[in-house]
């Protein structure tokens, strides 16, 4: 189960709330902050190396043999890679080709649209124009996945309840 969408749309908040609702699931936190801890530049400053590190993170998550709830997935990598100036064309081709091979590994996509302004936490981008472009790209990619996806809206608990209804 992959939680996807632009930054600052409530994914991590809902991810944390889902932990006590899905006790038999493994929870995998988002990758961007993880690779940033290794010193890779992130957000608009991301590079080919950043994106390949994030690719490794997402592919490793798919190797886990249990039910997963993911705060971001390979789709996020594809979307954000399309908006980076510092990424080589061959790396973007690799990411897109890999996406086409792994996208069916996800059983459920949960899409978080933009409903409120970005929160400046010192890590995520607060560039609203960039964020809106990212959101539109998510919508395009979601239309290309085989599985139907759920769009969640409202308060965090309303979103959790929508997910519970969708997953049962």
What does each model-found stretch correspond to?
Residues 6:
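P-loop (Walker A) phosphate-binding loop of NTP-binding proteins
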Residues 11:
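Conserved lysine of the Walker
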Residues 3:
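Hydrophobic anchor at the beta1->P-loop junction of P-loop NTPases
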Residues 19-60:
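Conserved substrate/cofactor phosphate-moiety recognition/catalytic segment
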């Amino acid at each position: 189960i992959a939680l996807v969408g632009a930054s600052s749309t409530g994914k991590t908040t809902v991810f944390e709330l889902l932990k006590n609702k899905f006790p038999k699931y493994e929870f995998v936190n988002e990758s961007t902050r993880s690779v940033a801890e290794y010193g890779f530049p992130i957000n608009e400053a991301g590079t080919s190396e950043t994106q390949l590190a994030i690719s490794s993170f997402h592919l490793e998550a798919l190797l886990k043999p249990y039910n997963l709830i993911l705060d971001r997935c390979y789709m996020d990598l594809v979307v954000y890679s399309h908006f980076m100036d510092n990424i080589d064309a061959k790396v973007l081709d690799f990411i897109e080709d890999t996406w086409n091979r792994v996208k069916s590994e996800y059983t459920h996509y949960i899409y978080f649209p933009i409903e409120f302004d970005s929160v400046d936490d010192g890590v995520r981008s607060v560039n609203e124009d960039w964020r809106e472009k990212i959101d539109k790209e998510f919508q395009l990619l979601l239309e290309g996945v085989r599985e139907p996806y759920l769009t969640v809206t409202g308060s965090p608990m309303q979103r959790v309840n929508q997910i519970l209804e969708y997953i049962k």
